[in-house]
Amino acid sequence: MTNADLTEVQYFANSLGVGLTIDGRNGYFTRRFCKMFQDTFQIGDYSGVGRLVVDGIPGPKTLEAMRICKAEGGRVSRHFHYKEFRNKGSLTPTVSNHVIRLERELVEGLERLRKVAGPIHIASGYRSPVHNRAIGGVSNSQHTYGRAVDLHRSRMRSNVTEAQARAAGFSGVGIESRSNNSVIHLDVRPTPTRWYYR
């Protein structure tokens, strides 16, 4: 891998809203971004590249996948884009905004759910710990691990039921019952959990 390859990776990451320093080095945040990309890219194998080795090294296959992803508008899967999951806490890059944490199981579950519920609109995906604290999120929020999304129920054709969410592979389900803010929280935490917002 050359400095030019690493610079390409950094520009690509920034096109997704990550905010890496463009220095052509394989530093901590560049490696972390590469690992996340390698782990999540090709869910549903929509481009034919296949699974990538998750090693944080942008080899030829990873670079090819990044170029395809860029040409496809930054898609992480057939129906979802990386930008939909990014931290919305700040437009100014900070240490906490240099990453998009995103678990493969989360995106796979969203693809399965979309098959039965139709188009899905993500209100919130990954949150940096700093942003999560600022909005009053719980300290162990699954959003900070890239395992959770909040969906706009009002923008969907049909209401997602708990049964549909569980069948799609979501273990954490939180349903908003206030009429002024209709969202559903879904996550892929290790232990099944359900709650209602009041």
PLM region descriptions:
Residues 1, 19-24, 51-53, 92-103, ...:
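Second-shell loop/turn segments in exported
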